[in-house]
UniProtKB/Swiss-Prot annotation:
InterPro entries reported in the protein's UniProt record: NA-bd_OB-fold, Rib_uL2_dom2, Ribosomal_uL2, Ribosomal_uL2_bac/org-type, Ribosomal_uL2_C, Ribosomal_uL2_CS, Ribosomal_uL2_dom3, Ribosomal_uL2_RNA-bd_dom
SMART domains (alphabetical): Ribosomal_L2 (SM01383), Ribosomal_L2_C (SM01382)
Name assigned to this protein: Large ribosomal subunit protein uL2
Keywords: Ribonucleoprotein, Ribosomal protein, RNA-binding, rRNA-binding
Organism encoding this protein: Roseobacter denitrificans (strain ATCC 33942 / OCh 114) (Erythrobacter sp. (strain OCh 114))
Top-level taxon: Bacteria
Compositionally biased spans, kind Basic residues: 254-264, 271-280
GO biological process entries: cytoplasmic translation
Gene coding for it: rplB
HAMAP family: Ribosomal_uL2_B (MF_01320_B)
Subunit structure: Part of the 50S ribosomal subunit. Forms a bridge to the 30S subunit in the 70S ribosome.
Role summary: One of the primary rRNA binding proteins. Required for association of the 30S and 50S subunits to form the 70S ribosome, for tRNA binding and peptide bond formation. It has been suggested to have peptidyltransferase activity; this is somewhat controversial. Makes several contacts with the 16S rRNA in the 70S ribosome.
A GO term for molecular function: transferase activity
Length: 280
């Protein structure tokens, strides 16, 4: 999908760059594959804000997307490509030979009428899913499981992908777009191709109101807050914060390592995504 820029006929149109979604399905989603979605405004079950800058926005229906791809050796035809308000990627409605319908993440170069299949060893074409044990090294992949049968967790956002670069015992080595090199079990499933909508990050929404429609609220800098609200707050007049940059909870930000050294998954990370910085 290409980008669409607008003439500055109004202040909100000036600089506006959006994704051209004219080729996507214009109707409503499949009712059996949707659920209601209530808003929480970034609050958890105790009512406290756990995710700042969230709230409001247009009402959404949740589309039930199949991240597991565990319906093996049954071919499915792509019925249509749809917009999903709950994620940056597009989704594809597929219909299996037995009549069942499902939503999957739409990879790049997947078109209406294409056939996709999940199998122990499938063709290397966008949308096909298989475990690493049946996949050739060098394959570009997305929707990667971290635990067998749990469903894809890595490389699900628009334009993202990873590369299968090697085998090591019962593990597969994958290189993520962040530069991280990590291991996952060879029984884990992954889908061939890169996720659709790679131009998503090049959009310019043009005005604050468009972000409010998406449920995004303003972000306030710590240095303009009061001391009770942020470690950078307070002071007479404009100040620099007076200390190294930290989060509202006092944790170093902008580059300092804050990962727990005892985290179990550290032994599965061969090369950190930070290794390219400062010669680490």
């Amino acid at each position: 999908m290409a980008l669409k820029s607008y003439k500055p006929t109004t202040p909100g149109q000036r600089g506006l760059v959006l994704i051209d979604r004219s080729e996507l399905w214009k109707g409503r989603p499949v009712k059996a594959l949707t659920e209601g979605l209530s808003k929480h405004g970034g609050r958890n079950n105790t009512g406290r804000i756990t995710m700042r800058r969230k709230g409001g926005g247009a009402k959404r229906l949740y589309r039930i997307v199949d991240f597991k791809r565990n319906k093996m050796d049954v071919a499915a035809t792509v019925e249509r490509i749809e917009y999903d308000p709950n994620r940056t990627a597009f989704i594809a409605l597929v219909k299996y030979e037995d009549g069942e319908q499902a939503y999957i993440l739409a990879p790049q170069r997947l078109a209406v009428g294409d056939t996709v299949v999940a199998s122990q060893k499938a063709d290397i074409k966008p949308g096909n899913a298989m475990p690493f044990s049946g996949m050739p090294i060098g394959t570009i992949i997305h929707n990667i499981e971290m635990k067998p049968g749990k469903g894809g967790q890595i490389a699900r956002a628009a334009g993202t992908y990873a590369q299968f670069v090697g085998r090591d015992g019962g593990y597969a080595q994958i290189r993520l777009s962040s530069g991280e090199l990590r291991l996952v079990r060879q029984e884990c499933m992954a889908t061939v191709g890169a996720v659709s909508n790679p131009d998503n990050s090049n959009q310019n929404y043009g005005k604050a109101g468009r972000m409010r429609h998406k449920g995004v609220r303003p972000s306030v800098r710590g240095v303009v807050m009061n001391p009770i609200d942020h470690p950078h707050g307070g002071g007479e007049g404009r100040t620099s914060g007076g200390r190294h940059p930290v989060t509202p909870w006092g944790k170093p930000t902008k580059g300092a390592k804050t990962r727990n050294k005892k985290k179990a998954s550290s032994q599965l990370i061969i090369r950190s995504r930070h290794a390219k910085k400062k010669g680490r």
